[in-house]
Amino acid sequence: MTTGGKPLGIALVSGGMDSLVMAEFCTRESNLALLHVNYGQRTESRELSCFHAVAEHLKVPTRRRLVVDIGYLAQIGGSALTDDRIDVPKADLARRGIPVTYVPFRNAHLVAIAVSWAEVIGAKNIYIGAVAADSSGYPDCRPEFFEAMNEAIRRGTKEGSGIVVKAPFVHLMKKDIVLMGKSMGVPFERSWSCYREGEKACGTCDSCALRLRAFAEAGVPDPLPYETRPDYARKSSS
């Protein structure tokens, strides 16, 4: 389906910085419908509020906004983001291995929902703001994951649907996403990256650390209030 000369696309918008910039960027290519998924995460209410703020910023009509609840991911557990019994760890950007904030196979669930909706509304492109190069190392954010998902979509959807999942930022550094967002005038204050729920971002979880480092490296002030703002600058090898 095309609207206004552009194909219809679905952007997965979590309410975070990456998906905010990605959604703005993808309006150049597609007329967007926006999808948000509640999965029992600690910051569910804050993320949902940011999703609606992004939708208003992009002037996406309510008929092209979808909010879906899949609380079963919290029932499954296994992640500090969905299980209050597992503490959100202090930031360690040099950590190797998969952190406890990884929600097992989450992106497969999100993409599957987006594909189902795409078949119904005639969308061709599905956009997700996954970042592999400068991130926490989640396995379902890797390029090969999305390649495999596209093969599954090709085999598992109606012939001629032409649905493709795109992760346009997967190879970018986060500072480049900040610079791109600044150049497009995105409202960073309407995004939330912290793994904890609070009036202010904690500044001490991995997600806050990655965001603070990205803004610092980009030389752009982060408009979010933080409980604390440690220096997460990369150490020089010299």
Pin down the residues of each PLM region:
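Short Fe-S-cluster ligation motifs
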Residues: 209-211, 215-238
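Short alpha-helix boundary/capping motifs
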Residues: 54, 146, 205-210, 236
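ATP-dependent adenylation/nucleotidyltransferase module used to activate substrates
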Residues: 2-184
